[in-house]
Amino acid sequence: MTEEQYITALTNNPHGIRNIPNPTEAMQLTCVGQNGMLLQYIKEPTQKVIETALSQAPRAIQFVENPTEELLKTLVEKDWAVLEYISDPSDTLIQSALAQSGWAIRYIANPSEELQLEAVKANYDALQYINAPSEVVQLQAVQESYLALRYIDEPSVAVLEAAVKQDPQAMRQITTLTKDLALHLFKVSAAIVGYIPNTLGVTVDEIKAIIVDAISGDTVDEDYIRELINNKAIGGRQSKWPIDLLSLIDAYGTKIVKKIAVGEYLKY
């Protein structure tokens, strides 16, 4: 067969390259131009063939012997997932990959805590690719999204506190929720009160006692007070927690709490 005939055949079936001894550069280009991964079947490819293959499939870098740092940098900048096929990547390549996606952490061997933090800041769910993340990393992840709790087997109380502050829906992700824990988390975030399951046996009086402590204490958490006032789960008889919050504020609230309450109610 002539080179032209081979090229015609390879155009229709590029995988045929593996059965051709000593294919010409033109034949090689015909194949890798369609499927860069076919580079694995080409012995001693020219630079042009390598570049064509990588342009079509960056993952073909795994079949390139001794690639230059410049080439690797160009590929990683195009597709962070290429990091998977780079052995012992430089700090520059790692930073480039993480700048695109926190998921790149999965391809970094023994990443430092600093790199782990960078990863979960970019993508909270990168936590799933980190082996035994420290509490610091867990905290950063849940501060980005409470859904990071899905990837933490035994979250500490501090992590749970951070999660409910990020979003009260975090309560739905807590698989070991107890009455005591629910009451503790209510002290941290008033917004979670509507997510406390009835099955825990939390009483109205217990919720009321925590509210009284919050509004009468020497130190006032203004955000907490606003969460209380604007929480639809607390209020009339039809609400989940039929507590007359205004009466409690009037009877036990500090001047600061009463001022906040007036400001919040004037919004409506």
Predicted features, each with a name:
Residues 1-268:
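Alpha-helical scaffold segments
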